[in-house]
Regions:
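Metallo-beta-lactamase
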Residues: 1-159, 163-174, 189, 197-284, 319, 379-406, ...
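Cap/insert and terminal regions of metallo-dependent hydrolase folds
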Residues: 1-32, 38-44, 151-160, 164-165, ...
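Catalytic core of the metallo-beta-lactamase
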Residues: 111, 119-122, 228-316, 335-342
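Active-site metal-binding loops of divalent metal-dependent hydrolases
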Residues: 133-135, 171, 200, 251-252, ...
Length: 408
């Protein structure tokens, strides 16, 4: 597959297939009458945003010092191309693998297996999908106030290779960053990158990023689209080319970028697979159950979100899961929308992930738990099920994880 460079025959033309309107199948209980969206399950209870809630949150907030660098993830140089020292056979194996690089917080660059050969001497690679990219220093409406990075991205945004799709889970500032998205869009040839987001976000991409109508797709839960590189051949579609299947899947969260737009847009997780092989699930930002005060150590019997088991039934198994493990304390306030590591393990099992990487930690201090706590709790939770660190663990910034997958 050639690099995503616009030429007469390799631009993204008509590449997103499917009806223009969100599909009508499935339960639409998450659609709020009159507009907006809700979490439709007993597993979600809103703690509220009134003065009493804010006061209780303030009283329970414990400030921890930023850990020294040697206790946080190390920095690695990403492997976006096979090392020159590899033998021809080893290079073939590298191209055949699914590859995921953690770029901090919830940002991953995933490269699916490459085809057996590239036409015309073009770069040989698989589809590249970038999830929730944020390079800004603050995750805030302003770069003068709001949470500052504790750790920097492992590469500059200029070192990011060309990507075919950018997939967004929801519109919170630590997942949807206007400066980053503008840079990506402007750095690549026109029409060479497609943006996917949940319902209600298309207008923002059109106005804030300046994308054309055909360069962004918004989807409802369980809607899916197919992405192809290259224009359709004369007389019909080129069914021989590589294809990327993008499925918008549910999760339990909320949205808003200001004071008056709470839940006006949808939140989502994503299941994405390539016709060349490999399937991943990106959890975005999600809760699993609401934990009342005093029940932090007594989770049995609490309602859990049924969406993840449904994802596993409909879309599993997944070769890789990218699952949030941080920003969870205090539980009475954040449990309905942010997984603690004990919840993350349940997602790994229910979504049916062969391997998972923990994310949504060690980048910004968004909640009061000590920053190095999430991977420790994750390891303890995994051990309860006999899940080893090679199956579900954390990785270093910039580390490229290779996963063997079944070629198609």
């Amino acid at each position: 597959m050639a690099p995503v460079v616009v030429t007469g025959a390799s631009s993204l033309q008509g590449a997103v297939s499917g009806s223009e309107e969100p599909s009508q199948r499935g339960d639409k209980a998450h659609h709020k009458e009159g507009g907006g969206f809700v979490n439709p399950w007993p597993s979600f209870k809103d703690p509220g945003r009134g003065p009493g809630t804010l006061w209780q949150a303030y009283k329970s907030w414990e400030t921890h010092p930023v850990p020294p660098a040697d206790l946080l993830p190390s920095y690695r140089t990403p492997t976006f191309a096979p090392p020159a020292s590899l033998s021809a056979q080893d290079k073939d194996e590298w191209y055949a693998d699914l590859k995921a690089t953690w770029l901090g917080h919830a940002c991953f660059l995933v490269e699916f297996p490459a085809p057996q050969s590239a036409p015309g001497g073009a770069e040989r690679r698989g589809y590249r999908v970038l999830f929730d990219p944020v390079w800004s220093h603050r995750c805030s409406p302003s770069q003068y106030i709001g949470p500052q990075r504790v750790t920097k991205p492992p590469i500059s945004i200029d070192e990011l290779p060309a990507v075919d799709a950018v997939v967004i889970s929801h519109n919170h500032y630590d997942h949807l960053d206007i400066t980053t998205l503008r840079h990506i869009y402007q750095a690549q040839p026109k029409g060479s990158v497609h943006f996917f987001a949940p319902l209600g976000n298309k207008a923002w991409f059109r106005s804030a990023i300046g994308v054309d109508e055909g360069e962004v797709t918004e989807l409802d839960w369980w809607d899916e689209r197919e992405l192809r590189l290259g224009a359709a051949k004369e007389g019909g579609r080129d069914d021989e080319g590589e294809r990327l299947r993008v499925v918008c899947t549910p999760c339990q969260h909320f949205t808003g970028r200001g004071l008056m737009d709470r839940n006006d847009t949808l939140w989502a997780s994503w299941s994405i697979s390539s016709s060349a092989g490999g399937k991943v699930w990106f959890g975005g930002d999600t809760g699993y159950r609401t934990v009342p005060r005093g029940r932090e150590s007594a989770l049995a019997g609490l309602p859990v979100c049924p969406a993840f088991a449904e994802i596993g039934r409909r879309e599993g198994p997944h070769d890789l899961g990218m699952i949030p493990i941080g920003a969870y304390d205090p539980r009475w306030l954040f449990s309905s929308v942010h997984c603690a590591p004990e919840d993350s393990v349940e997602l790994h099992r229910e979504v049916r992930c062969r391997k998972s990487i923990g994310m949504h930690w060690a980048t910004w201090q968004l909640t009061p738990e000590e920053m190095t706590e999430p991977p420790k709790r994750l390891r303890a939770a995994c051990e309860q099920y006999g899940i080893g660190a090679d199956e579900f663990g954390v990785t270093d910034f910039g580390a490229t994880v290779r996963i063997k997958v079944e070629r198609r």
